Amino acid sequence: MKGFKILEHSDIEKDLELYHRLGAKKGVYLGFKSMKDFYSMRESGVTDWTGYPSSGKTELLLECLFNTANFYGWKHLLYVPDIGDEIEVMSILIHKYSGMTFDKKYPNYISIQDVWRSSSWLLEHFKILKKTDPKASITPIEFWDFAIECKKEFGIQTATIDSWKDMRHDYSLHGGYAQYLSHVLPYRNMISEQHNIHLHTVIHPKTPRRQDGKIVHPDVDDMEGGAQWNNSGKVIISLHRESKEANHVDVKMLKIKPKIVGKWGFFAINFDLSKSRYFDINSEIGGTKEYATKEIIESKPNSEAISNYQLDNPF
């Protein structure tokens, strides 16, 4: 049958021997103690990020990508029109890299020399896809196929879409949105595994739900086509904060697959606007801010997460 075959020993011999010797491949540690047990990132995988505008989802995603570049030398493909043009994207990355801002009203206003130094390193590790024709558009599948070409050319480990709404979606060819997602998301999973690349997607929720006058932290069902995202997704992360002024961000792990990369649950993290960096608060030493570090190279297998996992659940 075209596009399929019966599995043979030669197809899996090498990978199965490696799995027997090393076990399931863990993700790399992303620098935060608060996140350690809940989420790690490995090269083959997909992560979907959701949250209302100004929830911090893009900032945390970029922070995780920046940390993997800084700690492990990873390279990333970005198609992020939701952030803004290429200058806006670079200004955010430069702020993270240097700890200095382009806003003149702050004492850590960056010099042009630091801009050039930062840009050189960042453009080596972040391959930013720029639209040159205002009429041009790209489908998710076209982007993911392009990411595989970039992996061959530049050695990238991840590719990011921010956001899903900025892609061209040919719903009518598949009988509607739900059927469309059922077509494109399994394709994403397959090429991620085949080509050992991590694919990130930012998806905006639908109209906010309210409870007691407050906006509710979005769940999978708040995503357009939530059932399909839940069925085909691997890792789904939802961010929420009570107000745009708050630096405290609540993070829910709505789905984790495979279990070796994290666990379901909730953690909190904080954002330092002056540095454009996230941090943990160490209450044991007077509420000290702890920014991401590479002290722990990889997340260790989480025995609690494994023990809490329903072993009779094949998914």
Give the predicted meaning of each segment.
Residues 32, 36, 71-155, 266:
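Cytosolic-facing regulatory segments adjacent to core modules
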Residues 160-161, 197-204:
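Structural recognition of the conserved hydrophobic beta-strand(s) that form the central parallel beta-sheet
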